Amino acid sequence: MTNIHNHKILILDFGSQYTQLIARRVREIGVYCELWAWDVTEQQIREFAPTGIILSGGPESTTEENSPRAPEYVFNAGVPVLGVCYGMQTMAMQLGGLTETSDHREFGYASVSLENSTALFANLNDNSTASEPKLDVWMSHGDKVTRLPENFKVTGTTLTCPIAAMSDENRRFYGVQFHPEVTHTKKGLELLTNFVVNICGCETKWTAENIIEDAVARIKEQVGNDEVILGLSGGVDSSVVALLLHRAIGKNLHCVFVDNGLLRLHEGDQVMEMFGDKFGLNITRVDAESRFLGELAGVSDPEAKRKIIGKVFVDVFDDESKKLTNVKWLAQGTIYPDVIESAASKTGKAHVIKSHHNVGGLPDYMKLGLVEPLRELFKDEVRKIGLALGLPAEMINRHPFPGPGLGVRVLGEVKKEYCDLLRRADAIFIEELRNSGWYEKTSQAFSVFLPVKSVGVMGDGRKYDWVISLRAVETIDFMTAHWAHLPYDLLGKVSNRIINEVNGISRVVYDISGKPPATIEWE
C-alpha cells in the first residue's frame, strides 16, 4: 500500500488569515502537510519528521520584543525552510539579520523583480521579457527585512521593499515577503511546487485514490470486526464517511438517518434511495418529525431553536443506538478545520492533528470509541474523495445547508405548515437557478419563510397569505459575501412560479444585503 504520509510538510502557524490556504495549496500539489502552532517543541518536530518546513505569515511585528519566534530547531533540522511574510522576517531576525517597521506599508498587488537565480523561482516569470523576470504577487506587510543574515542573497525586490525575497541555497532556506498561497499571486502554486517537490524532494502521493486506500486500511485496523454506528444526514461529510466505512467493514456499519421534518423537498426519500438502494448500505430511517416539531412549538428564539434541534437529535440517535447492542464505535464526519478550530478554542492556537478531538454533544453514557476517517482532510479534499467513491457531482457540489435545516430558515416559531410551504418554494427557486445556469455561479442560494402575511390578488379575489424571501450570495470564504445580481427575468419567473404553484404564498421578495453587515443565513 502507498505510504501517503511518508513525505510531509510541517507548517508553523504565526496567525495569518491565509495559513490554512498554505496547507490547502500543499495538499493540492499532492503532498501531505499538517498545521501546528509556532511554539511547538523540538521533540514534537523530531517525532513528526517533516521533509520541509513552512513558516506562515502573521499579524505580529518582529520589531516587538515578545513577538513569536520559530523554534531554533527549525533551522537545525537539516530540512528546507520557507518563510512567508512574517515567516521570512522571523527567519531573518533569528539568523542574524535585521527587520524594521516600513515607512510604506505594502498591501495589495506588487511586481517583484527577480535577481540572483534561486531554485525557488526556477522557471517562474510573469514578465513578457525573459531577460527581466518579474512576478506579480500579493503583499500584506508593515515590516521589512533591512539586513540579510549571513550567507543569504537577495532574490527579489520591489520599489518600496529592497529585500522582497531572499535565499541561502546551501542550507535551502528561503524567504518571500509576499503570499504565494493566495490566487492573486499568479505563479504562487508553481512557487510552492518548486519548494515542496523540487527543493524538499517530496513525492506527490496525496491523491484521492491513495487517500481512500489509506482510510479503508486504517478503518479496518482500528475497528476490526466490531460494529460501527453513524448518523447519516445526507450531507457531504457524513456521506463520504458512510461510503468509506461501508467499503472497509460492509454490513458491520449501521447508518441512522434521522428525518427531523426540517429537510428539503423529498430529501429523506433521496437519502434512502441513494444509500440504501444504490450503494446497499445498512441504513435505518427514523421518522422523528412530530418529535422535533413538538419540542419546537412556541419557540421563536433562534439560539433556543438550535439547541432544541441539537438535543432532540442526540436523544433520537441515542434511542436508536440502544437497539444495536453490539455496536462498539461511533463514526463522525470531523474534518481538519474542525480539528484546528477545536484546538484553537481550547488553547488559543492550532495544535497537533494527532491530539484527540471529540466533537461534543453526545451523552456521556455512550461509551463508544470514535472513528473519524476525515479528520486529516479539508472540505475540498472530502468532495474529491466523494466523487471518487461514486457520489454524484450534483450532490457533492450542493450549496451549504444549515445543521438545524429549515428550523432556522423559518423565522420565529417553526410549524409543519410553514416548513411545507418553504420546502416547495425553495425547490422552485433552486430548480430555476439550475435551469438558468445560475446555481453554479452562486455560492449559496435558498428561500426564507417570513411569518408575516401580506395582501395579494388572485383572479377576482384578494388573498392574505405568507411572504417568502429569496437569498443568493457570492463568496470565496463565507466570511464576507456579496448578494448575487440575479437577472430580473429570472427573479420574476421564480416569483411567479412560487405565487402560482405554492398555495399560501402571496408575495416574494429578494434579499440584497451583503455580509457584513448582514449574515448569510437570516437566523
Curated annotation (Swiss-Prot):
Pathway annotation from the record: Purine metabolism; GMP biosynthesis; GMP from XMP (L-Gln route): step 1/1
Record EC number: 6.3.5.2
A single Gene Ontology CC term: cytosol
Database matches in Gene3D superfamilies: 3.30.300.10, 3.40.50.880, HUPs (3.40.50.620)
Lineage: Bacteria, Pseudomonadati, Pseudomonadota, Gammaproteobacteria, Pasteurellales
Subunit note: Homodimer.
Residues reported in the UniProt entry to bind ATP: S233, G234, G235, V236, D237, S238, S239
Domain spans labelled Glutamine amidotransferase type-1: 8-205
Record function comment: Catalyzes the synthesis of GMP from XMP.
Coiled coil, from the record: none
Single annotated GO MF: ATP binding
Catalytic activity reported: XMP + L-glutamine + ATP + H2O = GMP + L-glutamate + AMP + diphosphate + 2 H(+)
Gene name tied to this protein: guaA
Enzyme class: ligase
Catalytic center residues: C85, H179, E181
Organism: Haemophilus influenzae (strain PittGG)
Annotated ranges, domain GMPS ATP-PPase: 206-398
Protein name: GMP synthase [glutamine-hydrolyzing]
